[in-house]
């Protein structure tokens, strides 16, 4: 009789533990889905902003190149042009549509997001400095 009682209690504990593990797995998978959706939305917004910034920078670079193509440049102008060229190279290196679709299909990785933040931070700083210098010069 004691043996039956021990087996019954053990069975109840095991089934409660199994239900607990199953509930934990379900809540984790739901959390992963929500996190992936929010990251996808953030990435979409970032892509739109990056495309707009890239188009604006390309236009600015063309205008500056035309302005300084035939004229003499000061050291400051030369530095601004070097910064803009570096920014354009950085933006072009981010523009790989094949890799972007692969990343979307396999999910988002925190390392990739951190890498993009590390790239975009200095790029935006350089753009701000370059535009500030140009506005000072024009004004």
From Swiss-Prot:
It is found in: Secreted. This is Maximins 4/H3 type 7. The lineage of its organism: Eukaryota, Metazoa, Chordata, Craniata, Vertebrata. It comes from Bombina maxima (Giant fire-bellied toad). Expressed by the skin glands. One of its GO terms (biological process) is defense response to fungus. GO terms for cellular component: extracellular region. Belongs to the bombinin family. Residues 19-43, 74-118 form a propeptide. Maximin-4 shows antibacterial activity against both Gram-positive and Gram-negative bacteria. It also shows antimicrobial activity against the fungus C.albicans, but not against A.flavus nor P.uticale. It has little hemolytic activity. It does not possess a significant cytotoxicity against tumor cell lines. It does not possess a significant anti-HIV activity. The modification Asparagine amide is found at residue 70. The modification Isoleucine amide is found at residue 138. InterPro entries: Bombinin. Keywords: Amidation, Amphibian defense peptide, Antibiotic, Antimicrobial, Cleavage on pair of basic residues, Cytolysis, Fungicide, Hemolysis, Secreted, Signal. Residues 1-18 form the signal peptide.
């Amino acid at each position: 009789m004691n043996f039956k009682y021990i087996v019954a209690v053990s069975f109840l504990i095991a089934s409660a533990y199994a239900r607990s593990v199953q509930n934990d797995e379900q809540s984790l998978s739901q959390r992963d889905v929500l996190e992936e959706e929010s990251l996808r939305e953030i990435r979409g917004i970032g892509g739109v902003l990056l495309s707009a910034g890239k188009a604006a920078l390309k236009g600015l670079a063309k205008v500056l190149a035309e302005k300084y193509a035939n004229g003499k440049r000061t050291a400051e102008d030369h530095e601004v042009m070097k910064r803009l060229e570096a920014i354009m190279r950085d933006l072009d290196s981010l523009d790989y549509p094949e890799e972007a679709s692969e990343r979307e299909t396999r999910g988002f990785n925190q390392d990739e997001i951190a890498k993009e933040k590390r790239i975009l931070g200095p790029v935006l700083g350089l753009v701000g400095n370059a535009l500030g210098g140009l506005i000072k010069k024009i004004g």
